[in-house]
Design a protein with these regions (language model features):
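Alpha-helical transmembrane segments of integral membrane proteins
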Residues: 49-61, 92-99, 129-137, 176-177, ...
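Hydrophobic alpha-helical membrane-insertion segments
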Residues: 57-68, 132-146, 242, 252
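Alpha-helical transmembrane segments of polytopic integral membrane proteins
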Residues: 105-108, 112, 141, 145, ...
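Transmembrane helix-loop-helix hairpins at the membrane interface
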Residues: 176-286
């Protein structure tokens, strides 16, 4: 089309690339479907329930296996007499720990394979400084939680309910403590409470998965006095796994934590009290 410029008397043609302005339709965010939201909530509750039942099965199978082991020990003791001291502190430590790690864990790991995974952890790369900072935080949480648990235990009419476990650890052979508390416990507990549990909950929110892992880890320790520090430590290590996706990191944290708190500190304390003979950390075999 030709336009006449009345002011200058010139003729010009419009640029073919010029377009008339167009009105944009208003954008509306889609409203969530109430039925889909309700279905998602049901799936979430079902997933959390299945994981919780697996944790309960872990404790029940452990208890049942411990009873079976005790019955077998009584039979062996009646046959062998005093040939093996099953009822010493080291024997009791093994009878308490091995059913959990060698019987209950494989059984519950198989059950959890029936629960589909949901979500995945992040893949952050951490440096040594951050790991060191988190370990210092873990030691602080462990100390504060232990103090709180002991204060609560003192208020109980029966006294602290962790006293028997403390006695077992303090009086067991150092090699038994290394096997159970430094090697087996960190590997089994981190694989279960961090890897297996969180891989099935992270899809419903990182915070929910971390809190659930911490609560289950605290309750798995079996007494109220130990719940506080185990819950706090469980939260911290669950956070580490959620951010890095490396269960090996949390196993390493757990091993070092138990080595310092459950072996080195105990052996130094026994040495100071004259309960250890021979080289450092080597207890006399009775």
């Amino acid at each position: 089309m030709i336009y006449d410029d009345e002011n200058r008397g010139r003729v010009w043609e419009p640029d073919p690339q010029m377009q008339a302005p167009q009105m944009q339709a208003p954008q509306y965010s889609p409203q969530p479907d109430p039925q889909q939201a309700a279905a998602m909530e049901r799936r979430q509750r079902k997933q959390f329930s299945h994981v919780g039942m697996a944790a309960a099965a872990f404790m029940l199978i452990t208890l049942a296996a411990q009873v079976v082991v005790m019955v077998l020990v009584m039979l062996l003791d009646s046959l062998l007499g005093d040939f093996i001291d099953f009822y010493g502190f080291s024997g009791r430590m093994l009878m308490s720990s091995l059913p959990m790690y060698l019987v209950a864990f494989p059984a519950v790991a198989g059950l959890l394979q029936l629960v589909p995974k949901c979500g995945s952890p992040q893949k952050e790369q951490w440096g040594f400084g951050r790991f060191a900072a988190f370990f210092v935080i873990a030691m602080g949480i462990g100390l504060a939680g232990n103090i709180l648990g002991r204060l609560v235990g003192i208020l109980q009419p029966s006294g602290p309910d962790s006293a028997e476990l403390d006695q077992l650890i303090r009086n067991s052979n150092v090699w038994v403590n290394l096997l159970t508390t430094v090697i087996m416990a960190p590997v089994v507990e981190e694989l279960f409470f961090r890897k297996m549990v969180m891989d099935r909950l992270l899809g419903y929110g990182q915070k929910a998965a971390i809190i659930m892992s911490g609560i289950m880890f605290g309750m798995a320790h079996g007494n109220f006095s130990q719940f506080f520090y185990a819950f706090g430590i469980g939260l911290l290590w669950a956070y580490v796994y959620a951010k890095t996706g490396k269960v090996g990191y949390t196993i390493g944290f757990h091993m070092l934590f138990n080595l310092l708190g459950g072996v080195i500190t105990v052996e130094l304390s026994k040495g100071a009290q004259g309960l250890t003979r021979g080289p450092w950390m080597i207890r006399q075999i009775e």
